[in-house]
């Protein structure tokens, strides 16, 4: 009888360890997903497109791990086997037992599968509430602030050439087109596009007029704004960091609210292989000049006297 009771306690303990780990992993992906959704996603003019991106892209890891945990609580053996199959799928996906994939994905999935296979958390209803409730609570708490910020963005729908003056900088910013594209590219392509841009900023010339250029990192930092007001940014070259009176956002006159681009190249080089990029919220990071994802774009600038 004592052996049976010990076995029951052991299976309960293993079950709750599995529930705790699954809940922690699911909560992490809930936090990451909702933060990233409102940082780089939620840019479409269609609510349904935004919701679809939220569920299928940013919350997919959370939903997968939550589903795995629920299956494992209700059908422990099936859940344990499913974890093992996913570990094998991860091995196939990464094509080899790389150190990163092994320690961060494969081994955790296998270990969690064994715990769920052997464990029996009781009461089961409480385990289900924990697996569902904690990640969803994390999602809501982490998402309130970013959701409010995005909902309060100002959008005047103007994508023409803009003259922006303030905080010691006065520049014309290129209109939508080759000098302000909707998708990104590498630093070299951005430099070339600016150099070939004609006076009106709408077309490229056959020979480089060199009227336009990329903004320096200091110019970009000093030009950042929120709700139509300059953010009072200053660039500290010694620490390679930007400081603002108020956090900038993805808004006019510089940014397109409905564009997937959230980073811009600057003209400021770190060395032959790296240059600074600026995020719409004002952060500045070094990046390889050969990097060219769709969300890393640019906007050319030119120096001309302010219109009368």
Where in this protein do the model-derived segments appear?
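Aromatic-anchored segments of alpha-helical transmembrane domains
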Residues: 25-32, 84-96, 137-144
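Membrane-helix interface "capping/anchor" motifs
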Residues: 69-82, 119-125
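Central hydrophobic cores of alpha-helical transmembrane segments
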Residues: 78-90, 129-133
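Internal/C-terminal transmembrane anchor helices
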Residues: 123-150
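Extracellular adhesion/carbohydrate-recognition regions
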Residues: 148-212
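An exposed tryptophan-centered "aromatic clamp" motif
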Residues: 195, 199-210, 217-276
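Short, structured beta-strand segments at or near domain termini in extracellular proteins/domains
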Residues: 263-265, 286-308
